[in-house]
A protein has these predicted regions:
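Nucleotide and nucleotide-moiety/phosphate-recognizing core
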Residues: 1-105, 115-129, 136-141, 148, ...
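Short glycine/serine/threonine-rich phosphate/pyrophosphate-binding segments
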Residues: 110, 114
């Protein structure tokens, strides 16, 4: 069985390890854990990982966030991966830092990356893991917040949640969406 694991983020060193690029960080951690290696390919950095008899095509689009769907659609079609075997990992300001939420479908919630994926796939029915980043920013400064780096005191919890998100990817592929949702959606993370 084949899966497409998508980390949403913006390409470029200035965006490395920002809140908005947590999708990239999670996918990078998954690929590193399983001794994969990213290669620059069409529309994305791509790594192939084999684990427990399953193939994971892991991508970090190089298209910028608001065009991520182009890369998702291209790699889904190229690798002939069913929409239910896609997992998109993204940041979410509406969730506190200690939460993650796994869903089989849903709205874009105002997230430009998810909006692009939805438009390119012509569907809202694809699994997504929302990584809570909190909303501790003054009114009108959301862009600065999401494009900003983690605060020092947030880093231990972010590191833990990245490890847990890697486990979510593994569980999604081995146990299925429903069982994994039960575990993830009720959990609160702390260090």
């Amino acid at each position: 069985m084949k899966f497409l694991i998508v980390g949403l983020g913006n390409a470029g060193n200035e965006y490395t390890h920002t809140r908005h690029n947590i999708g990239f960080d999670v996918v990078n951690a998954f690929v590193q854990k399983h001794a994969g290696k990213f290669v620059a390919r069409r529309l994305a950095y791509v790594a192939e990982v084999k684990w427990k008899g399953k193939m994971f095509i892991c991508i970090c689009p190089t298209t910028y966030m608001n065009l991520s769907g182009t890369a998702v659609k291209y790699w889904m079609d190229k690798e002939k991966i069913a929409i239910g075997n896609i997992l998109v990992i993204t940041d979410d300001v509406s969730l506190p830092l200690n939460k993650m939420r796994l869903r089989p479908s849903g709205s874009d919630g105002g997230h430009n990356g998810l909006k692009s994926v939805e438009a390119s796939l012509a569907s809202r029915d694809y699994p997504r893991l929302r990584f809570g980043i909190g909303n501790d920013y003054p009114k009108g400064l959301q862009s600065n917040y999401v494009l900003g780096k983690w605060r020092k005191e947030e880093e231990p919890l972010v590191k833990l949640k990245i490890e847990k998100a890697v486990e979510v990817i593994e569980s999604f592929a081995t146990r299925g969406l429903s069982l994994t949702m039960n575990d993830v959606n009720s959990a609160e993370y702390s260090v």
